[in-house]
Amino acid sequence: MPPKTKEKGTKAGAQKKKRNAGADVEAESMRRLALLEKEVLQDCLALQRDEARRAKASEDQLKQRIKDLEAELEGARSEGKAIYAEMSRQCRSLQEAMQSRSRQLEEEVEGLREQLELCQREAEAAQREAKQALGERDQTLAQFRAHVADMEAKYEEILHDSLDRLLAKLRDEASVGRGCAETPHQAQGAAPPVWTQPPGSLKL
């Protein structure tokens, strides 16, 4: 394994070079910053001089404009009185028109409010009628279902009675026929068909 002394010396030299390079970079940065500040100050001074010249020119123009406006104002004072009188007349006319329109709108609002109240009362009455009609419909449907169920029960009872009578008649006929001629099926002891469905189980 090589000795570590040489590696330590190499690292120390590299770190020294880095420090020197960092110092050079910092010095260059400071120099550039100073130049930049100088340029900025020069630009600011030039800008201030330009603004001062423009402000002076604007001040002169403003003074001249004020003089012109004063002259125009003096010449328009007489016209201003007439204009003021005309505007006052128009303002009064406009106020009267606004008051008339306001009264008209108030009347329209009152009429619409009355119509709304009437519509609400009619809607409430219609809702009550609809609710009552639904109740009557439900009651009628319940009565109809009860009637249908009663009719079904009666029809089942009638049908079962008819079937019972028919079976009894068939048994009687079978008993009579057994005395005359015995079929092979009956000879083996087979019982005649019997209705086994209980009453009430038949669905129409």
Curated annotation (Swiss-Prot):
Give the matching InterPro entries: DRC12-like (IPR033585)
Per UniProt, the ranges with Basic and acidic residues bias are 1-10
Domain of life, per UniProt, equals Eukaryota
| Main localisation | cytoplasm
- Coiled coil residues, start to end: 45-159
Subcellular location(s): the record lists: Cytoplasm, Cytoskeleton, Flagellum axoneme
A single Gene Ontology CC annotation of this entry is:
cytoskeleton
The ranges of region (Disordered) come to: 1-26, 175-204
Answer yes or no on keyword Aminoacyl-tRNA synthetase.
no
Keywords annotated in UniProt: Cell projection, Cilium, Coiled coil, Cytoplasm, Cytoskeleton, Flagellum
Q: State if ATP-binding is listed as a keyword.
A: no
Q: Which family does it belong to?
A: Belongs to the DRC12 family.
What the protein does comes down to:
Component of the nexin-dynein regulatory complex (N-DRC), a key regulator of ciliary/flagellar motility which maintains the alignment and integrity of the distal axoneme and regulates microtubule sliding in motile axonemes.
Q: How does it assemble?
A: Component of the nexin-dynein regulatory complex (N-DRC).
Q: What is this protein called?
A: Dynein regulatory complex protein 12
